[in-house]
């Protein structure tokens, strides 16, 4: 079952990765080989987890790159669904079969 309002994955990075190891933002950025600002933007929800950042998080803290990306996708979808009523599109055709990923 999908969460209706999942938290930004930056919170998981902060509380599940950095905090237990008592790492500061600067120390975490050094571990991940990113700028302090880039990590801070992720932690405060200004930036999302890219595929590259997911690999960095996987290598540094575990958790599987795919899982980090799924967390970001779930958050992004929940945010988009909040605005779904404002998205104006015209249906072109009905599908005979559902699209599968």
Where are these regions (language model features)?
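Peripheral/terminal regions associated with large enzymatic or DNA-binding modules
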Residues: 5-6, 26, 59, 65-67
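Short, basic-rich loop-to-helix N-cap that marks the start of a DNA-contacting helix
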Residues: 46-59
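Base-recognition residues in the alpha-helical recognition helix of bacterial helix-turn-helix
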Residues: 41-44, 70
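Short, charged recognition helix plus adjacent turn
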Residues: 63, 69-101
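The DNA-recognition helices of helix-turn-helix-type DNA-binding domains
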Residues: 35, 46, 61, 72-75
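A short, Lys/Arg-rich alpha-helix, primarily the initiator
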Residues: 1-23, 70
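Alpha-helical structural signal
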Residues: 14, 39-40, 65
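Short alpha-helical DNA-recognition segment
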Residues: 22-41
């Amino acid at each position: 079952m999908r969460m209706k309002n999942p938290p930004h994955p930056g919170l998981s990075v902060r509380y599940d990765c950095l905090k237990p190891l008592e790492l500061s933002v600067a120390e975490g950025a050094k571990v991940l080989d990113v700028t302090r600002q880039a990590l801070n933007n992720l932690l405060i929800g200004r930036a999302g987890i890219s595929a590259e950042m997911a690999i960095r998080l996987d290598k540094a803290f575990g958790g599987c790159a795919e899982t980090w990306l799924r967390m970001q996708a779930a958050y992004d979808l929940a945010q988009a669904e909040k605005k779904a009523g404002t998205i104006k599109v015209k249906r072109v055709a009905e599908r005979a079969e559902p699209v599968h990923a």
